[in-house]
Amino acid sequence: MQFRSPLRRFDAFQKTVEDARIKTASGGLITLVSGLIVIFIVLMEWINYRRVIAVHEIIVNPSHGDRMEINFNITFPRIPCQILTVDVLDVSGEFQRDIHHTVSKTRLSPSGEIISVDDLDIGNQQSISDDGAAECGDCYGAADFAPEDTPGCCNTCDAVRDAYGKAHWRIGDVDAFKQCKDENFKELYEAQKVEGCNLAGQLSVNRMAGNFHIAPGRSTQNGNQHVHDTRDYINELDLHDMSHSIHHLSFGPPLDASVHYSNPLDGTVKKVSTADYRYEYFIKCVSYQFMPLSKSTLPIDTNKYAVTQHERSIRGGREEKVPTHVNFHGGIPGVWFQFDISPMRVIERQVRGNTFGGFLSNVLALLGGCVTLASFVDRGYYEVQKLKKN
C-alpha cells in the first residue's frame, strides 16, 4: 500500500492526469510569444545590470596647500619664440619667471612648418677659454644681477640681457655687449623675426588664485608691478600680433576620453590684425575625483574648469562688439589665463546600473508576471472558442 504524506493536503499546485490535459494551437502560439518576450526581458535586464553609470557627489574640498599641474599647447603664428616668455604669478606672491625647464618652444616658419631644433638657441652660447674653462663674461655694470649659477659673470648674451632686465636698465644696441656680438645675436634675431612659435609643456603652480601668461619681452618684478620689456615686439608691429590657437589646456592629470569631455578651451582659435592686443581667459577651476568601477584601479584626482573670455586693445577705447563699453588704456599685450580655485570638489563614481540581487529579483518577477499573463490570455481565448462552438 502506497504511503500518503499528510503534506499533500497543503499542495497549492494541483496536477491533472496526462489524459485530461488539452493542447491547442492557440496555446502553442501564446507560449512561443511569451518565450520570446521572456528572452527579451531577461536580455534587457542583463544589459541594465552590466551598464556602467556615473553617480556625482559634491563635497567641500578637504585638500589644501597642494600644487597643481597646468598642461598646455598653444601656437602663435606671428611671434618668434625668441621674444615670448611664460610667467606664473599667484596671490601668495610666488613668481615664476620665463619658465624654460618644463616648457618647450618650437620655431615655426611663416607657413607653419616646424624648423629644425638645431637652430633654436639665440644668445645662449657660453664662451669657453682656450684651456677649456668657462670664461667670466662682463656684466657691464649689472654684476649684482648675474645668474645664480655664475655669480658676478655674464657668459652669454641672454645672461647680460637678464641682468639688465633685473636691474631695470634699458638696453640700447645689443652689439655693445661682446657676448651678443660674438653670438651674432642681432643677425640671428633678424632672421627669426618673421617666424611663429609653438609652446607646449607643464607648469606647477600653487593651488590658489593666480595667473599664467604668455607675453612678449623679458619680464621683471618691480615691487608689486609685473613688467615686460616689449621693445623687440613693438619695433616690429607690422610683423607681430597676438593671434593664437589653443590646442590643449587642462589642469591636473589627463582623463581617458571615454570618461571625459574635451576641455572648454581646446581648439580655440583667435585672430587679430593689430599687435597691441590683449586676450584674457578667466578660469574657474574645480577639483574633480574620478573613481572607476574596478576596485583595483586607483581614483584619479584632477580638475575641471569653466571659462569666460575677454579681449581688448591696450590702447583703450570703445569695444567693437559692444560700443557702450569703454576699455581702459594700458597693459601688456599677450594671452593671460587668470585662474581661481573653487572650494568644492566633484566626485564621480562609476557603478553598475543594478546589483546582482536586484537583477535576479527583477528577472524572477518579470518571469512570473509574464507566465501568469500568458495563462490568463490562453484561458480566456480557450473559453471564448469553446462558447462559439456551443
Swiss-Prot record:
Gene Ontology CC: one annotated term: endoplasmic reticulum membrane
Keyword entries, A-Z: Membrane, Transmembrane, Transmembrane helix
Topological relation to the membrane, as annotated: Multi-pass membrane protein
Keyword Transmembrane helix: yes
GO biological process, one term: intracellular protein transport
Pfam families noted in UniProt: COPIIcoated_ERV (PF07970), ERGIC_N (PF13850)
Protein's name according to its UniProt entry: Uncharacterized protein C24B11.08c
